[in-house]
From Swiss-Prot:
TM annotation in the entry: 6-26, 45-65, 67-87
Alphabetical list of NCBIfam families matching this protein: PRK02913.1 (NF002791)
Database matches in Pfam families: DUF986
Species name: Escherichia coli O157:H7
Protein name: UPF0266 membrane protein YobD
Length: 152
């Protein structure tokens, strides 16, 4: 096993740990989930480039008769990238005292102002940062509003 294979195993383990945390651990942290809203995905061009580069590496490894374990590890990395970027749905998870947005816990007390833009983006102003929340279904904005009013 080469250093390349060890690095590939490390990246696969990191992506797998992130996927497990995102799917199973995060929804159970900080109390029961009051509301989970699916969000719009950002540009997918980055994911296409990532998976495309991995496919090029697989092709290069096969044509140069590289190690079979490296080909399998590259394939596993491509599948993990495909899952993370294309299958997994980003979401905002509301709890009793705060919410998870982009896997970061934000307490309700940190929200200084909220606005709704013309194109349906909820803008939350924190102390030093703005959150742009793009929901998949525009009706979910009303559900978020009702939840925030009832918890504040």
């Amino acid at each position: 096993m080469t250093i390349t294979d060890l690095v590939l195993i490390l990246f696969i383990a990191a992506l797998l740990a992130f996927a497990i945390y995102d799917q199973f651990i995060m929804p159970r942290r900080n109390g029961p989930t009051l509301l989970a809203i699916p969000l719009l995905r950002r540009g997918r061009i980055d994911s296409v480039i990532f998976v495309g580069l991995i496919v090029i590496l697989i092709y290069n490894n096969v044509t140069n008769h590289g190690a079979l374990i490296t080909t399998w590890l590259l394939s596993a990395l491509a599948l993990m990238g495909f899952y993370i970027f294309w299958i997994r749905v980003p979401k905002i998870i509301f709890k009793q005292k705060g919410f998870f947005f982009a896997n970061v816990w934000i307490e309700y007390s940190r929200i200084k102002a909220m606005n709704l833009s013309e194109d349906g983006v909820l803008v939350m102003q924190l102390e030093q940062r703005r959150l742009l929340i793009r929901v998949r279904n525009i009706d979910d904005l009303e559900r978020i509003y009702k939840l925030l009013v009832s918890t504040q």
